[in-house]
């Protein structure tokens, strides 16, 4: 790790500031107990930035992110700003421009089922008795969401719309390399998702992935069509390790993997560019309905910080300790409202304190 690691903190809207406060506790421990040299600066973004500065992504925020080594992001958006034109709303006008500006082409979404929380999964207990730990690797800047032409047309009293799925071989190549590299840190398995029996873009996808796989002979590669993959995840999620997906298919698959864990409040995510600059954020939204009530689950935000430590700072052992602190908290029976079966649950700040204590003491 470099001598001083600079992190831009963007709490955002809704529950973002609340759960970010708990991440700050972990950051303090990293500095005080693990002697990490961190430079932390907080910046405004999203709806709160619109309210205060008239724009969702202020220049000061963008500059602060540019001068940092990583971004720890909270959440943006809420009904309060739904009256704005869609392209000026917090989600469209802050997070998407950040991804574009830094060319964050790869999105990682872990989906892990903790044994203590199996009862929350919508999947039958006999299917998930052995748990699962899946990492979705999604290409984020290509595919049908960005392909041209894309339009909606009304002509001769007939209306039609069209989008274009476009993938270049280099886009597939770089995301495939990342998936195989990550598989080497896990169970050495990659399953690539496509629709190569129908789509030309998927035929190219499969060909490039096959070519890349030859550079990783120790990693087992399999392929599934997207329709079969969605079924297999429900039937036996434990069979998967790393899922390699295009933008559209990754959007679908990562949400499916998330929902079968039982609580999206547990799930972190990370997005990278080719220089390993990353944006780390919870997979869930801003949850404005519970904002300010001190009931949000801070685990996704804390695990997002863990991903920053693991992938950004390359400090796997310290990231493992953060992950272990979360696991120990759950094993000891501590719960927030979203993962509790009764009214005996912890507030957001209390859960953060518990995890912080386990991180310091290790038991």
Curated annotation (Swiss-Prot):
PROSITE patterns documented for this protein: IDH_IMDH
Enzyme Commission code(s) on record: 1.1.1.85
Manner of cofactor binding, per the entry note: Binds 1 Mg(2+) or Mn(2+) ion per subunit.
Binding site for substrate: 99, 109, 138, 227
Enzyme superclass (EC): oxidoreductase
Site, Important for catalysis: residue positions: 145, 195
Keyword tags: Amino-acid biosynthesis, Branched-chain amino acid biosynthesis, Cytoplasm, Leucine biosynthesis, Magnesium, Manganese, Metal-binding, NAD, Oxidoreductase, Plasmid
Cofactor: Mg(2+); Mn(2+)
Binding site for Mg(2+): 227, 251, 255
Cell compartments where the protein resides: Cytoplasm
Gene3D superfamilies recorded: Isopropylmalate Dehydrogenase
Pathway as given in its UniProt record: Amino-acid biosynthesis; L-leucine biosynthesis; L-leucine from 3-methyl-2-oxobutanoate: step 3/4
Binding site for NAD(+): 78-91, 285-297
GO biological process: L-leucine biosynthetic process
Swiss-Prot/TrEMBL catalytic activity: (2R,3S)-3-isopropylmalate + NAD(+) = 4-methyl-2-oxopentanoate + CO2 + NADH
Pfam families (UniProt xref): Iso_dh (PF00180)
Stored SMART domains: Iso_dh (SM01329)
One Gene Ontology cellular component annotation held by this UniProt entry: cytosol
Primary residence: cytoplasm
Family to which the UniProt record says this protein belongs: Belongs to the isocitrate and isopropylmalate dehydrogenases family. LeuB type 1 subfamily.
Stated role: Catalyzes the oxidation of 3-carboxy-2-hydroxy-4-methylpentanoate (3-isopropylmalate) to 3-carboxy-4-methyl-2-oxopentanoate. The product decarboxylates to 4-methyl-2 oxopentanoate.
HAMAP family tied to this protein: LeuB_type1
This protein's name: 3-isopropylmalate dehydrogenase
Species this chain originates from: Buchnera aphidicola subsp. Uroleucon helianthicola
């Amino acid at each position: 790790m470099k001598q001083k690691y600079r992190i831009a903190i963007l709490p955002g809207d809704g529950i973002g500031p609340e759960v970010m406060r708990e991440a700050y506790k972990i950051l303090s421990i990293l500095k005080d107990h693990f002697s990490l040299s961190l430079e932390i600066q907080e910046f405004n973004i999203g709806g709160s930035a619109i309210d205060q500065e008239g724009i969702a992504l202020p220049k000061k925020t963008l500059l602060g992110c540019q001068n940092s080594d990583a971004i720890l992001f909270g959440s943006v958006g809420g009904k309060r700003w739904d009256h704005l034109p869609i392209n000026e709303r917090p989600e469209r006008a802050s997070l998407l421009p950040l991804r574009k500006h830094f060319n964050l082409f790869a999105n990682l979404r872990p989906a892990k089922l903790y044994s203590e929380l199996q009862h929350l999964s919508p999947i039958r207990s006999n299917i998930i008795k052995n748990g699962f730990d899946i990492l979705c690797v999604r290409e984020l800047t290509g595919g049908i969401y960005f392909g041209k032409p894309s339009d909606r047309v009304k002509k001769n009293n007939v209306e039609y719309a069209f989008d274009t799925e476009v993938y270049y071989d280099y886009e597939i190549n770089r995301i495939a390399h990342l998936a195989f590299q990550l598989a080497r840190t896990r169970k050495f398995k990659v399953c690539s998702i496509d629709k190569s029996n129908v789509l030309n873009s998927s035929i190219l996808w499969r060909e490039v992935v096959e070519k890349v796989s030859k550079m990783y002979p120790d990693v087992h590669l399999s392929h599934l069509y997207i329709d079969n993959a969605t079924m297999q995840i429900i039937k036996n999620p434990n069979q998967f390790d790393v899922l390699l997906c295009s933008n559209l298919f990754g959007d679908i698959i990562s949400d499916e993997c998330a929902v079968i864990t039982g609580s999206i409040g547990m799930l972190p995510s990370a997005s990278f560019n080719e220089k390993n600059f990353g944006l780390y954020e919870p997979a869930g939204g801003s949850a404005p309905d519970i904002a300010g009530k001190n009931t949000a689950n801070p685990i996704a935000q804390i695990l997002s910080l863990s991903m920053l430590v693991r992938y950004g700072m390359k400090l796997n052992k310290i990231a493992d300790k953060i992950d272990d602190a979360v696991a120990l908290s759950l094993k000891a029976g501590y719960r927030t409202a979203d993962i509790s079966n009764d009214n005996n649950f912890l507030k957001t700040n209390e859960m953060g304190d518990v995890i912080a204590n386990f991180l310091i003491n290790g038991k």
